[in-house]
Amino acid sequence: MVWCWGMRPWIAATALLAGACAHSPSAPQPVPTPTPNPVERFPVAGVVFYDENANGVIDDRERVRLPGVSVAIGDRAARSDAEGRFLIADATEGSATASAEVESLPPFFTSGPVAALAVPPPPGFLLAYPVGLPIERMRPNLYMAFGDSITVGDGSRDGDGYRGELEAVLRGYWGAGSVANEGVASTRSDQGADRIGASLTRVRPAYTVIHYGTNDWNSYSCRWVPSCHTVSSVRSMIGSARSVGSVPVVGTLIPVNPAYTDRMAYERNVWVVETNERIRAMVKEEGAILADLHAGFTARGGSNLETLFVDHVHPNDDGYEVMATEFFRAITSPRGSASR
């Protein structure tokens, strides 16, 4: 029993039952934890567009929208859909800026400056997120197909080869795109290196799409020397394109039709494989875009590679479709994708 000083016994007993004395110390009380103010979050909608003139706003003629781009506002992010639109459902209230994940952009595209925005935005607000392409004075959305008779489209039913299909898929994906034909039949890669400057000046393409070297095999000096002048010539083409602001896209050499054994198809395909090894390494060194057409042909044709050809070297429509698919994949895939 706790005895309270000055209490009579019967009072002390009562105090014991009550559990306290007038001057006994009380137990420490816990300090209340302040309740944090809830974080307010609001939706922000936007669209990723190709800002052709770098003015930060969508002009009437700027039709290209970029799918698959990851855009972040604060600690929240969303990926743009097929029409370039995105919705961040829960952006944090306050002043914020948007940013794009570089690895989600296609090769050579850069994220443009975006002014700060207030969250929540006003009703009906759509954030226009600009991305750019460093093409200087070249013509936006114009692709120059550069090569020999395969680029011309020999063997295809419509005479367009891969160009028509590539143009169609680019327009369907970006919203714009035209492919110009600068192929010259029967030319070698060294001849292509000599003439590309004139083509670039005349066409002024945003992209230069190169497939050159198939006819180099016809030069006796090249036949038994893998790559011969092929790699140095294609390297020169890359430099010419880059010097005027055109984005270089290089395709590996497609195989030849293995059924034409009387035209040394086996030996020629060995040469193609060895040459492509050097082309891949060179393109990586130069920092250009690589489209692995040879890998696309072998994946599609398998053990029936001859089904992709109309003669000993020219593809049929199915073969040209493979070329268009691989060029399209190289141009549009995110730079951080596993295919690169």
Q: What are the language-model segments listed below?
A:
Residues 95-128:
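A short, solvent-exposed loop/turn motif at the edges and junctions
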Residues 255-340:
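Catalytic His-Asp segment of secreted/periplasmic serine-dependent ester chemistry enzymes
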Residues 87-97:
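Short Pro-Gly-centered beta-turn/loop motif in secreted/extracellular proteins
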Residues 36-41, 47-66:
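Structural motif
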Residues 211-217, 237-273, 294:
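Active-site segments of SGNH/GDSL-like serine hydrolases
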Residues 44-50, 84, 131:
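A short, amphipathic beta-strand motif
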Residues 132-185, 197-204:
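Serine-esterase "nucleophile elbow" of acetyl-processing enzymes
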Residues 58, 65, 72-87:
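Short, acidic Ser/Thr/Gly-rich low-complexity loop/linker segments typical of extracellular
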